Amino acid sequence: MKRWKAIWLVIIVALFCIAAQAQNQGQSVDAILDDSFRSMYNLQFDQALSKAEQAKQVDKTDPMPWVAQASAILFREFDRLHILRSDLFASDDAFSSRPAYSWVPASRKQFDDAIAGGEKIAQDRLNRDKKDVKALFALALFNGLRADDAALITKRNLTALSYTKSSTGYADKLLAIAPDYYDAYIATGMGKYLIGGKPAPVRWMLGTTPGFSEWKCEPLSSCHLRPPGPQ
């Protein structure tokens, strides 16, 4: 059961890495995405979606704005359903007894459309270049988003595990090409923990105020997460 409590971390952790990466790169699309993810973590979903749409217009061949869009829609639904309240993850019993929820139909369609649109862009990129790391990373994240939906909203545990395996598969392909693409280790490490039940050094604090404690994944000491803001 502990692995099911961890499944939601796959995409949430990876998305925070994207925000930090965007700030460091300083590129136009990435800078806009940085604003989008920060707005999302601050529960400013309209602003997050507006920034994601802006990034889509800057580069229509980049799947990452679609990741940001789908993420904001999913987090908005989490917030509406109070899914990320801390007591849900306080114990195995609390998590296993969680109910299955229903999406707002319009939001469900927005989420599915965002993922479908982004996956098409990513697959088109892979058709041109099988080693396109951005496409592989986006596909890993899209499957992670689907896993979070299945695990935390609709409570389809086996479906969530299937999406997690797919996410890990794309991340493994990426790392075979670019072993220094550290963000992808999050998906593989968490995925292998969920599938194999091996211990994972995960620390997470999630309360009423959006934010994160420092998170480190081994064996890569270079993979860190810190709260938003200047360091």
For each feature predicted by the language model, list its residue ranges.
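Bacterial N-terminal signal peptides that target proteins for export
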Residues: 1-8
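Bacterial N-terminal signal peptides
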Residues: 8-17
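Sec/Tat signal peptide C-region and signal peptidase I cleavage site
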Residues: 18-22
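Short coil/linker segments at helix-helix boundaries
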Residues: 24-35, 39-51, 61, 72-131, ...
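Acidic donor-binding loop at a coil-to-helix junction in glycosyltransferase catalytic cores
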Residues: 64
